[in-house]
């Protein structure tokens, strides 16, 4: 395939991703009246189609002023999100990376059963485990604390499933050579597995961050004190 065709395909894909981001950015500079006018056919069931201009007709900084200056609780909720999400992502890597390495590089009894259990737990939606998680966290005295969000998130099985593929792709010749040079299992993991598995680790970090930064059900269920709420629960209320 010629280079110009590849460039056109990549440009089209980039445009497909860029357009929604640009729409969000332009909407942030629109006043409420202009936004309602653009979406009137959808909001009021009028005849016609909603339209979205490339640039706001009457740009304004009012939404930013209202959010950043007139709503000081925004910064509290932002800090709450950081306190919850960053420990979760760090815990997922600290716990998940060694587990993924073990699944990818070692043979042990019960490996298939344990891996199947990981897959089953990964496929279970939060609604299935919500009641049991509630009772466990309540018995541990963690309800209405940030740990009620951090601990279940840090032991998520999805990062393990994701990183296994990247660790398994590392050539066995490299680990065998390191073993012959006298490196132990832990040294091989630290000095060989982690550097070569960076793409998988970064993928797990990005997906884990997005998942828990936008989480709604977990904080809504486990956090009754609104001062502990993250941005994902606070922002939907700002337009009221």
Regions found by a protein language model. Name each.
Residues 2-240:
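A structural signal for multi-pass alpha-helical bundles of membrane permease subunits
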């Amino acid at each position: 395939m010629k280079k110009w065709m590849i460039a056109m395909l990549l440009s089209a894909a980039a445009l497909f991703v860029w357009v929604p981001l640009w729409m969000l950015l332009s909407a942030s500079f629109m006043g409420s009246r202009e936004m309602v006018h653009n979406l009137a056919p959808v909001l009021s069931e009028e005849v016609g189609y909603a339209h979205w201009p490339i640039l706001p007709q009457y740009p304004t900084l009012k939404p930013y002023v209202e959010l950043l200056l007139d709503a000081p609780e925004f910064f509290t909720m932002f800090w709450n999100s950081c306190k919850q999400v960053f420990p979760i992502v760090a815990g997922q890597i600290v716990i998940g990376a060694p587990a993924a390495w073990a699944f990818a590089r070692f043979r042990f009894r019960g490996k298939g059963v344990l891996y199947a259990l990981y897959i089953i737990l990964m496929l279970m939606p939060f609604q299935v485990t919500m009641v049991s998680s509630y009772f466990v966290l309540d018995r541990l005295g963690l309800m209405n604390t940030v740990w009620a969000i951090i601990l279940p998130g840090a032991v998520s099985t999805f990062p393990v499933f994701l990183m296994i593929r990247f660790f398994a792709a590392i050539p066995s010749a490299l680990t065998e050579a390191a073993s012959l040079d006298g490196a132990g299992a832990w040294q091989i993991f630290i000095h060989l597995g982690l550097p070569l598995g960076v793409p998988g680790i970064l993928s797990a970090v990005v997906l884990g961050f997005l998942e828990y930064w936008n989480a709604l059900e977990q904080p809504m269920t486990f956090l009754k004190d609104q001062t502990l709420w993250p941005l994902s629960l606070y922002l939907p209320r700002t337009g009221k």
